[in-house]
Amino acid sequence: MKTKFRLREKEKIFKNIRENGYAILHNIYSKKRINRVKNSLFSMLNYIKFDDKITDLQEKYYQVKDYNPNLKAHFYDMCAFELETRLALHDPIILDLVKGYFGTDVLFSGRPAIHIHDSENERFLEPHQETNMFSKDFLFVWAPLYDAKNDQGGLLIYKNSHKHGYWKHKVDNKIGSTNINLKKLKKF
């Protein structure tokens, strides 16, 4: 796995972020690193509902969800404190990129979050901006644990929307989360 980007590679990444609002970095994490995150999440779920017959993280998630939705929700909340995810977020290659992008050695980090693609999830978020950050200047890092497909497990990014600053959000959906009027996003 790559441990550092060359200066030219960094400049290309930074240009993509400035122009498009994002950059796609392929294969940043090794399979070993991803498996450590998956295994840790699996262990958390297996602690909630032990079953030595199930060894797949996704299957385990649905088992816990069926067993006790409240405990599944607590698992989701606890993921922000799970160390393997934090280690991945704070991987030296990511930190080096962020320092280079902002031209600083001083970094602050938010908490990692897990997005679980579950079509039955009532807390599915509508289009929104990540606005609850330390600063207006930040980079959002998203790394799938499984290969993302067009119709699931992905993240929708509205190219160039970052050039319009912060959008007015509303709170009119069934879960009371902030979201952006979809009509305004049609131009992207």
Question: What positions do the PLM features span?
Answer:
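Non-heme Fe(II)-dependent double-stranded beta-helix
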Residues: 1-19, 26-127, 132-133
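Generic beta-sheet signal
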Residues: 23-25, 139
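Residues in and immediately flanking transmembrane alpha helices
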Residues: 39-40, 141, 172
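A short secondary-structure junction signal
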Residues: 110, 120-128, 138, 151-157, ...
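Short, structured patches in soluble enzyme cores that scaffold and shape functional sites
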Residues: 129, 143-147, 159
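Short, conserved beta-strand element in jelly-roll/cupin
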Residues: 134-150
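Double-stranded beta-helix
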Residues: 150-188
